[in-house]
Amino acid sequence: MSAADPSQGNKSWTVADSAALYGLDRWGEPYFTANANGHVQVKPRGDQGSCLDLVELVEELKSRNLNLPLLIRFDDILEDRLEKLHSAFEQAISKYGYAGRYQGVFPVKCNQQRHVVEQLVESGRHWHFGLEAGSKAELLIALSLVNDPEALLICNGYKDQRYIETAILARRLGRQPVVVIEQPDEVERIIRSSQELGAAPFIGVRAKLTTRSTGHWSSSVGEKAKFGLSFPDLLSTVEALRQADLLSDLRLLHFHIGSQINDIAVLKDAIQEAGQIYVELTKLGAPMGYLDVGGGLGVDYDGSRSASAASTNYSLQNYANDVVATVRECCKPHGITLPILVSESGRAIASHFSILVFDVLGTGTVPGAVPNQTGEEPLTIHNLRETLAGVMATQKGAASEISRLQEAWNDAVKFKDDALAAFRLGYISLTERALAEQLTWACAEAIMGQLPCHETIPDDLQGLRAVLAGTYYANLSIFRSAPDTWAIEQLFPLMPIHRLKEEPTQLGHFADLTCDSDGKLDRFIGNGQTKTLLELHNLRQNEAYMIGMFLAGAYQEVMGNLHNLFGSTNAVHIRMTTGGGYQIDHVVRGNTNSEVLEAMEHNPEILLERLRLASELAIQRGELKINDVRRLMDHLETSLRQTTYLQG
């Protein structure tokens, strides 16, 4: 289905038109723009540094045998996000005269990749930036990487005795772990461990807030929240710590109201409630000192700056201002020392730095040209030809013709159904059945071509856009590289990274490589609303058509799975150099077929040996020649060494 004239795009189409169409000038700020060549360009330091042509970068990486799909991580963007976060809080602290400071942590669960976590720890060292762990494995990562005695190690999640003892003993290594009590039964384990080891960790408590949240993560708050202490539990925890002479170690209050807070009003209410809890804990005798506002600092995926699920109605500076101002308002009247502010803003830090680039393998469209009549045809075929002729005879773009076009489409659907019924009963041939289908789609295309552009169109005719849309077959696995698009209908910006000087004349959606009907991308960012089709270009012979998925640096890699045994993609870490160049800091090769087979307990050597023996038997039976066997085994051995994606 054409978005414009399918044979000829708009001659006056500009790069700016493409940027507006895909929302690049909204969600891409300040890291992604389009250049005069019609390519997406990356500004890893935002408006402060030089640019990289993304298409040229991809081609150079491909020449290094780093084939698509390819995950490109810009470490400069990661650093810039960290700087912007701290700068926003520094400005807010200065603006409101807050007698305290901000000290953030990165939740390791957001992106556990070694190079990512190492980069954040090193870049955040002068802010004493720390890490948050939610499991024993993540705690091990945090303890091994953070050697700054002033940086926080927030210990969240379920905790057994060994987890707690590890955190306590880590204080003697010069680390500063804070064991956050999230379940009532953890109090006794902390007390017992402290008594046995003769030492205690810094202790925190997570409160279940009653503030109503919104969006997918609204269940993170309230009485039925998975983690946190109710108000009675908070009081009993304080009393238990007092009895064990550990109340002096209660230093932190933590809450979490969701991974993506869309509405700033929700945040204000939550901080106000948490601020009062903090005040009351100090009145009960806890020294406190830290208020951890958790995650939730959102990402404006669709660029609409709204409270929709894919956006936020606030800026980073708005967020910092409200955190600082609200906590100050809660504590000041009570003469309480203002706490050090902590956030776990993983999504806001990591989302922007990663771009997934994949190629399109081909397209599936509705049947094309209709064969001319060569002889007598069944009545259903005759009726469809007459319907098509009638549509072609209508006045193009005339509002008065809408009802006639709607009637024609209803007729076409009826005649197609008649043809299907006739085929089932054996009255028409497969060739005639196929012709009926071709004629139906020809009617649909003709009707869409005749519709006026600026009139209200009936719903059934509007639906022809989806009926005629093409399927673009993507060289990736949604379940591996973008699982949230399937699991929670997360929206990520998607667009071609080249050909932006050309008007996209097709509408389509993407289907991935998996043998699963859910393996598709069919929800896209529109102008303030979600759309089911994306404007795309016709494919060209012997020319790659490359698509970029943006803002997907948080959660996607670790949550991806091996559906159909499609593994991780190739990944590179890019850093800008002086003079506008770049260097590749790290190359992380994607899973090979051999590796994913081994992950499922298959031994590649045994598999090859079985096939070799089967080939030898086939030679003996005269079913295969030696040259054929050599080619077969060569293909198999090469495939085991290659990544799991298609390579032409």
UniProtKB/Swiss-Prot annotation:
The UniProt record gives the binding positions of substrate as: 291-301
Q: Which UniProt keywords apply?
A: Decarboxylase, Lyase, Magnesium, Metal-binding, Polyamine biosynthesis, Pyridoxal phosphate, Spermidine biosynthesis
Cite a single GO MF annotation.
metal ion binding
One annotated GO biological process: arginine catabolic process
- Please report a single Pfam family linked to this protein: Arg_decarbox_C
Q: So which cofactors does this thing need?
A: Mg(2+); pyridoxal 5'-phosphate
Which pathway does the UniProt entry assign to this protein?
Answer: Amine and polyamine biosynthesis; agmatine biosynthesis; agmatine from L-arginine: step 1/1
Q: Give the catalytic activity.
A: L-arginine + H(+) = agmatine + CO2
Residues with N6-(pyridoxal phosphate)lysine modification: 109
Q: What is its EC number?
A: 4.1.1.19
| Matches recorded under InterPro entries | Ala_racemase/Decarboxylase_C, Arg_decarb_HB, Arg_decarbox_C, Arg_decrbxlase, De-COase2_CS, De-COase2_N, De-COase2_pyr-phos_BS, Orn/DAP/Arg_de-COase
Cell division listed as a keyword: no
Homology family = Belongs to the Orn/Lys/Arg decarboxylase class-II family. SpeA subfamily.
The protein's job, in short, is: Catalyzes the biosynthesis of agmatine from arginine.
Q: Which named protein is this?
A: Biosynthetic arginine decarboxylase
Organism from which the protein derives: Prochlorococcus marinus (strain MIT 9303)
Name of encoding gene: speA
